Amino acid sequence: MDKKIVIPGDLLSDDVKKSGYGTYVKNDKIYSSLCGIESLKEDKVGVIPLAGAYIPSVNDVVIGVVIVVTPSNWILDIAAPYDGLLHVSEYPRRVESREMPEILDVGDSVILRVRDVDSSMKIELALRDPNLHKLRTGQIVEVEPVKVPRVIGHGGSMISMLKKETNCSIFVGQNGRIWIDGKDEDIELLSKALRKIEAEAQRSGLTDRIYNFLKNERMKEKESKPVEFLKNEKTDVSVAKEDHSEDIYRKIDVLLDPKN
């Protein structure tokens, strides 16, 4: 069953203690303050917005794109209303001003952490972590920031399944930018899946839906291959391997949360 879409002013509950994100209380009742999906939990009633800009929070890990290089800072577009600032002191090693364009130049994509956000929305970024680095391969796909939780899935169920079924590396930035890398055909398939997740984020059973979509696309791809290629492929794949693959698919199907 699909989740309920609400608009500002819709009545959500008469238990004011459960008021959560995207709601307001009036006359001892909880109402929606956003256009989004109703989120009902045991102790909270909230609204997940259907759309909206990324609002940075401290310690968010995001993907930024360098837009300006100054003598002491890199300025990056982080898909927020305000740009982010990476000071040279936040780079992992000492950097001279003349080196800065050689290290990170305009157009480069980088995984960074939001170090600080002040009241005037000055956003400071950091790169002092082994997991934070410049992206040299792959490509970036952008989705609405509010859809990021659906790309990750409950307990990481969606992203784990995407990695397994597409054979791609994936990193999801909290600002809605997603880095993907792999073979060209796998990247194309994953991009389609991400667009489908974004378009159907409000639907229930999304992980299973995307899993079936990927299997169907793989089947279409296999059927469209030349006969000669299929013959070669058949000699390389034993029955045991095929059975093992199907067993993995069944295990994934059982582990996935059908309501996620």
From Swiss-Prot:
Cellular-component GO terms for this entry: cytoplasm; exosome (RNase complex)
Pfam families: ECR1_N_2, KH_6, S1
Keyword ATP-binding appears in the UniProt entry: no
Gene3D superfamilies linked to this entry: 2.40.50.100, K Homology domain, type 1, Nucleic acid-binding proteins
Cellular localisation: Cytoplasm
InterPro entries the UniProt entry points to: Exosome_RNA_bind1/RRP40/RRP4, KH_dom, KH_dom_type_1, KH_dom_type_1_sf, NA-bd_OB-fold, Rrp4, RRP4_N, RRP4_S1
BP-aspect Gene Ontology terms: CUT catabolic process; exonucleolytic trimming to generate mature 3'-end of 5.8S rRNA from tricistronic rRNA transcript (SSU-rRNA, 5.8S rRNA, LSU-rRNA); poly(A)-dependent snoRNA 3'-end processing; RNA catabolic process; U4 snRNA 3'-end processing
Residue stretches making up the S1 motif domain: 59-128
Key words of the record: Cytoplasm, Exosome, RNA-binding
Chief location category: cytoplasm
Domain KH: 136-194
Any one GO molecular-function label of the UniProt entry: poly(A) binding
Oligomer and partners: Component of the archaeal exosome complex. Forms a trimer of Rrp4 and/or Csl4 subunits. The trimer associates with a hexameric ring-like arrangement composed of 3 Rrp41-Rrp42 heterodimers.
Role played: Non-catalytic component of the exosome, which is a complex involved in RNA degradation. Increases the RNA binding and the efficiency of RNA degradation. Confers strong poly(A) specificity to the exosome.
Protein family: Belongs to the RRP4 family.
Protein name as annotated: Exosome complex component Rrp4
